[in-house]
Amino acid sequence: WGSFGEGRSKKAESLNSVAVPELERLAAEDKPFMLFLRHMDPHSPYLPPEPFERMFYAGDENDPNNHSLDPVYDFLPFRDYFCSWFPPKCTDAEYICAQYDGSIAYMDASIRIILDKLEYLGIADDTIVVFTSDHGETLYDHDCYFDHHSMYDNCLIVPLAIKFGKGCKKYFRGCKHVQTYAYEKDIMPTILAMLGIETDVKFDGRNLFDVLDGKVPEEPECYITEATWMRKHGWRTPEWKLMVALEPDFHFKPEIELYNLIEDPKENHNVADKYPEVVELLKKRMLDHVAKREKETGRTAPIYTNLNWNGFGRPFTSSEEAYRTMHIGNPEDAKRLQEIKKQD
């Protein structure tokens, strides 16, 4: 992962240094190939190399009068981890956000090298390139600092771009705009369709070109879950987002969260108490979906059975217990930091 003391790592360039020769080898073989590249930027720790470090920041990250990072340093479960890659004496949260932006710009430049190589090798027209991510990120949002373990849209919504050339020209739709939802489960059936590969496998996802052409139903509502740093599930519609905690989380969030995504797209105002009838309606849709999937698969939903997700052996009984137990970073340092906080 890297740390500030180890220096800024050119992670994307390191991967490209392996990927480019592999592309050359595969192109020379002149056979069908699949190449998976897992660029880690802009995953934390955000340590983009120069000049990307200051591309989006012109302030003083060590300003002693700036206290925007105080609540970040005060969050015990992640404090040890943050201190490992934040610059020493850094006080400005905007500087850390700028490192994330710089990491994105650095990755964009590195992906450009891959795309240019496909053109240079003369295989761009016969190559499908899929660009996506496994999660988004919260920066200074929802008091979930520089993390991605939640069910807010910051984390749920990810990019999906599919680039293809003349070899797949029948899939070109011009400048067509369709306002609908795509899911990562749709990627495999879409790619198989583009390659003309038929299979008897019944996918949960859809061919997105069928979605664009109106041949399959839209899926405007979806079931959402989180079971890494918290155990929650919920239901999302174009208008509403419901989140239900199955046990207390270490962010001290309420058990029920409801957001109006039309009026409050950044999900800053929990209106669960104001609209209890909406909570019950969405909860019923969610539980009906879970019951349907349990019947289809013959399995109990893992969100109910994975009770040792936290490594603690049982569900947490309070947010305070979760806060005092969970941590990322060096275990001994985390324990020491928590003991100091207890003494305070």
Language model features by range: what are they?
Residues 1-344:
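Catalytic domains that recognize anionic headgroups
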